[in-house]
């Protein structure tokens, strides 16, 4: 075992083995599918005429069998590729396995599209040649071509396979579409790599000081500081909506969220029922005071209590204020 392979973790090696299996299933399935289609067309289209008297029943059986096996292999490879992509998303890997370098520095999906395009293009050309150059007339086609005078009693000639002449160019067009998909996939991979390199360059440049030349003077500005709470968004997303408590590594809530939402802390959740009607007032003080504002928590029952005190004081003062009887 090479040292590079020994240094790789078991998960990466397992993913590479699965990727190779998916690739070979795709390729073998596509080859069997194309061969089966060709054998089926030749067995069911060309062998029904007397021009090919040696056509056996084996072609009519082997063609559909190869096509079905190839289609099953392609479907199995496709389902396995989707399962692997789902597993990588659960692991948190953003880059799909089909986009990684697989063969000659190219991705697996790009190589698959090239192979599919080549197979479909070759099959379409063979079918087109079979439909154009192989005559599909009866056994007496040569005799009827020589005897051009007696055409009244002769049946109309069916030379060439019209279905193959139509099906061949369609398969060629499908092969060209695979080449276009491969080109688009490569362009998207190149753009993604270029964006990643540009983001890395911007990140490295942001850590360097900025030099600004004004006339003969050169002003050097320090790099911007790192974010004060880099994990605030991640912790806020990971935290459940029902828990509003602050952890030591989380950023504090904003000023307005405290005075507007009024959500209780975990320590005071037991007394939340007693403070449902609590009102918060902010009263600005004088300039001479050390504090510029005082936050007073006034309950809804406080104004009636103040009125009771005032009435009590008035009742206590009323006997003293009345004149004494003579």
Swiss-Prot record:
Q: Name one GO cellular component term.
A: membrane
Membrane topology listed for this record: Multi-pass membrane protein
Where does the protein principally reside? membrane
Keywords, alphabetical: Membrane, Transmembrane, Transmembrane helix
Give TM regions.
Answer: 22-42, 57-77, 114-134, 161-181
Q: For the region Disordered, what residue ranges are annotated?
A: 229-326
Q: Give the subcellular location.
A: Membrane
Polar residues biased stretches: 257-266
Q: Return the InterPro entries for the record.
A: TMEM171 (IPR029173)
Chain intervals with Low complexity compositional bias: 230-240, 288-302, 312-326
* Disulfide cross-links: none
The residues the entry assigns to the signal sequence are none
Q: What is this protein called?
A: Transmembrane protein 171
